Amino acid sequence: MLEGYYIIENPGVVPSERRFRMKDLKAWGYDLHLGTIEGERAYFVSRTGEREEGETYSLQGKTYHIEKTEKEIPENARLLARIVIERGQPYLEFWLEEEDTVYPLAKEDPRIILKRLWEKEKLNQLLKHVRAVGLTTDFYKDTVFIKSIPLPYEEYPPKVRRVLREVRDIHRDIMGFGRFVFQYFGEENKTHNYRLHWTLPTLHLFDVEIANEIDKVLGMLD
C-alpha cells in the first residue's frame, strides 16, 4: 500500500487503562462474585455459569466462597482493565476498585477474550480481518479482484466517502487515536474493490458497543 492511498490518522494517546461495564464483563465470559478468599472479603470472577452462590471451592491453593453473584458493578466500585506486554506477549489485566481497595480479577490472553466476545456478538468482520493484537490492534481487509490502480479521493463514490466519514467520527469521538489507510480500486459487478489497514487501541475493542460499531464499518462496503 505504497501509493494511491487515503489516510485518516489521529495521533492521540493509546489509553493505559479503561473503565468497563457489567455487560462488557459478561461478554468476556465472566461472572463477578462477592465473597471471601482465604476468609478475607473479596471480589473475584469465574467463567460464566461455572459457579453458584453459596459455593466453596479451591483454586491454585486458595479457598474461595461465593456469597453473591453480582448483576451490576457495585455503585461504589469501578471495573478497570489495561493491556500489558510481557516477554513479547500481550495480557489483559482487569480489576475492581472499591474506594481505596483494589481487587485483582484476572490476567488473561486478550486474543482469547476478544475472540470469545466477537463470537458471542457475531462480529464476523472483526474475527475475519484481525491481524495482530497488542496495545493496539491491526485489521487488514483486501477485496481487490481486478487489475487496476488505486483511484484518487475525488473519484470515490458517495458510499465510500460515507465510510470514511464514519471512520473519522470513530477516531475523533470514541477512540481519540487511530490510523486508517485505504485504497479504492473502483466497483465491478456491484462489488467494491478496496484494501484497508486499520489500527485501533485494543482496550476499546473490549467494549461491546464499540466492537459492534467497528464491525459495522468494516462491513459497510460488502
From Swiss-Prot:
InterPro entries: UPF0128. Pfam families: UPF0128 (PF03673). Belongs to the UPF0128 family. HAMAP family: UPF0128. This is UPF0128 protein PF1488.
